[in-house]
């Protein structure tokens, strides 16, 4: 979304993040190494990201779509941007899920257990079709970072990823030793905090 807002490639966007397990927040935004945090958060709070998401969705009823309703709201309330999509963030804030009017206002899409079972069956069958040669194996790079992590731990070359580690100063407002989710360095000796990535409340 940030790359669309700033009309640039995803690789030109860098962020700092901080939070607790799976509930992390973008604290700083950079485009081509220029700090655009204030502008980015202002534009998000003004609804730009939500408008883009709704336009992209264009009537799509897929319950797995994120339309930026909750993220926009929370950015306005707290001054930071939730890093995960609405569907994941709302799991930490059940009040939004319980209230049907709030779900509708923010376009929070919930999924039934039956739909999850259907998706699981489809997602299990697809690799089987690939193994049987009935469907080509995708060759484009996945957005998942596990291959980079495995390669770093095998080769010893550093890979910087978002990880859960004991706080060693990455989040200055939280107690040392508390498990926090921030950028960390992974290599042959494991995962450790990145001393260059620290965040605190503004």
Predicted regions and their residues:
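Long, compositionally biased stretches enriched for glycine and/or charged residues
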Residues: 3-202
């Amino acid at each position: 979304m940030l790359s669309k807002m700033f009309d640039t490639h995803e690789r030109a966007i860098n962020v700092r993040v901080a939070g607790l397990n799976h509930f992390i927040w973008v604290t700083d935004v950079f485009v081509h190494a220029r700090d655009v945090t204030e502008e980015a958060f202002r534009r998000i709070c003004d609804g730009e990201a939500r408008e883009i998401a709704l336009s992209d969705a264009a009537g799509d009823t897929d319950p797995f779509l994120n339309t930026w309703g909750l993220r926009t709201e929370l950015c306005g309330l707290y001054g930071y941007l939730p890093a995960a999509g609405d569907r994941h963030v709302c799991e930490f804030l059940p009040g939004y899920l319980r209230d049907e009017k709030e779900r509708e206002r923010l376009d929070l899409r919930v999924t039934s257990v039956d739909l999850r079972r259907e998706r699981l069956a489809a997602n299990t069958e697809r690799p089987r079709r690939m193994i049987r040669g009935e469907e080509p194996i995708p060759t484009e790079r996945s957005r998942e970072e596990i291959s980079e992590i495995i390669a770093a731990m095998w080769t010893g070359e550093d890979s910087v990823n978002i990880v859960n580690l004991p706080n060693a100063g990455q989040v200055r407002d939280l107690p040392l030793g508390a498990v926090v989710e921030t950028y960390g360095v992974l290599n042959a000796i494991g995962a450790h905090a990145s001393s260059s990535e620290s965040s605190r409340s503004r």
